[in-house]
Amino acid sequence: MFKVNKTPEPKFFQEFKKKHSLSNWNQYDSYRYIKQQLREYSLFEEQELCCPYCEIEIDVDTSETEHIKPKDIFPNEFQDFNNLIVACKSSKRCGNSKGSQWSPDFINPVLENPQNFLTYDIKTGEVRPKNSIGTDYEKAKVTIDILNLNDKRLAEARKNFILGNKYSIDYLEPEGEFRTLKEFMIDNKDSITSV
């Protein structure tokens, strides 16, 4: 899970909201072009074509707009640009796993850096809390569970990535899929190559 550095709200979205007084997100279905434009903008300008939750590469067709704070629980934030990111469409993890679940302990990737809370298990590919007790542990645990970040296929993909790259860590590119896993591997190179 990576930090999303939001840009200022794009002018096209500001103008759309001025022109159309929508009262909920479902009304955006009549304006699919703006939803697509928002996804394109976020993917290219803020997320480097990756889901911020699972870090898998996505594109406009394999993604959906995600409300960090669920629109059903926070109806006044349904078009707050800082509450919108683009997530993968996986049916078992990320935004679809989260649905309308909410906890004040959920790590908001726009407001907080998930790397302060999360780490990796190099043997299993699973995401783990960085701390073993306290508030940071609780935030990590809640977020991992809500997003199902240890979905079997996802953990296996991370494990295979670690195994496939453990002897070429010096050549990993920082962008693209699994960017925080790559940073973790670089920072823990000695322990990874000894496994």
Q: Residue spans of the language-model regions?
A:
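Histidine-centered nuclease catalytic patch
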Residues: 53-86, 90-92, 96, 101
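Pocket-edge structural micro-motifs
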Residues: 88, 122, 131
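C-terminal, charged low-complexity interaction regions
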Residues: 132-195
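Residues that form generic nucleotide/phosphate-binding pockets
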Residues: 15-19, 37, 41, 87, ...
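Short, charged surface segments at domain edges that flank catalytic/cofactor-binding sites
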Residues: 2-50, 74-79
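Polybasic, low-complexity binding patches
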Residues: 74-82, 93-128
